[in-house]
Amino acid sequence: MADTWSIGAHAFTSRLLVGTGKYPDFPTMQRALAASGAEVVTVAVRRLDLSKKGEESLLAWIPKGMKLLPNTAACFTAEEAIRTARLGRELEMGDLVKLEVIGDRRTLFPDVEGLIQAAKVLVKEGFTVLPYTNDDPVTAKKLEDAGCAAVMPLGAPIGSGLGLRNPYNLRIIMETVQVPVLVDAGVGTASDAALAMELGAVAVLMNTAIAEAKDPVLMAEAMRAGVEGGRKAFLAGRIPMKLHAAASSPMSGLIGT
């Protein structure tokens, strides 16, 4: 049986979501997206140049069959984020939206108050809202109560590559909310993606870790393997951590005793 997961009315098999920014060129982006095996690709609505057509358009280089996830990157108020989400729907990108309301330009940490405000409005308008948020369990619960279809806590600041700085809070979030938890931002390498999945994340979203790698296509393959391996480890169930050793072979019945 396929290990599927869903958000709202949308079901997926791949647990890796990818972005479209920071690639050296569109052909490299296209090859990396295909190599990732991802089914969902996020696009910054405010950064789309709608005047470009054909091969000059970013959208033309996204592999066929990938689900577009418009995001509200570069929005610093709830009002901006709401307008941008509406624009994405007008451009026929669907009802899914990765909601971002940025509170600080240097760290790109979310404005929690604005995020919750925007989420409530968009949920009422029929959007399936996936909010990029901090790693605070209280905020995650408020976003769930606001009607969000998932929560997307950061592992570390966007583009930092620092990995999961607070895995304990992420685990608490997973225990606190009933909606899917996707780790978003901060992943630097495949082991970070694997750890997120081992903690119990439903999926992982990343962009910079692949796009700015020395070999984006190879890194996309590595991230795919990391996510798949981490998911299998979570399902298999790791052994408990112990302070002292536990011999793999029994001590009774040894030869010469």
Curated annotation (Swiss-Prot):
Annotated Gene Ontology cellular component terms: cytoplasm
Protein known as: Thiazole synthase
Family statement drawn from the similarity comment of this UniProt entry: Belongs to the ThiG family.
Predominant place of localization: cytoplasm
Catalytic reaction equation(s): [ThiS sulfur-carrier protein]-C-terminal-Gly-aminoethanethioate + 2-iminoacetate + 1-deoxy-D-xylulose 5-phosphate = [ThiS sulfur-carrier protein]-C-terminal Gly-Gly + 2-[(2R,5Z)-2-carboxy-4-methylthiazol-5(2H)-ylidene]ethyl phosphate + 2 H2O + H(+)
Cell compartments where the protein resides: Cytoplasm
Quaternary context: Homotetramer. Forms heterodimers with either ThiH or ThiS.
Pfam families: ThiG (PF05690)
Enzyme Commission identifier(s): 2.8.1.10
Keyword annotations from UniProtKB, A to Z: Cytoplasm, Schiff base, Thiamine biosynthesis, Transferase
Positions of 1-deoxy-D-xylulose 5-phosphate binding: 159, 185-186, 207-208
PANTHER family per record: THIAZOLE SYNTHASE
Record InterPro entries: Aldolase_TIM, Thiazole_synthase_ThiG, ThiG
Enzyme active site: 98
Top EC group: transferase
GO BP: thiamine diphosphate biosynthetic process
Primary role: Catalyzes the rearrangement of 1-deoxy-D-xylulose 5-phosphate (DXP) to produce the thiazole phosphate moiety of thiamine. Sulfur is provided by the thiocarboxylate moiety of the carrier protein ThiS. In vitro, sulfur can be provided by H(2)S.
GO molecular function: thiazole synthase activity
Keyword Oxidoreductase: no
Lineage of the organism: Bacteria, Pseudomonadati, Myxococcota, Myxococcia, Myxococcales
Pathway info: Cofactor biosynthesis; thiamine diphosphate biosynthesis
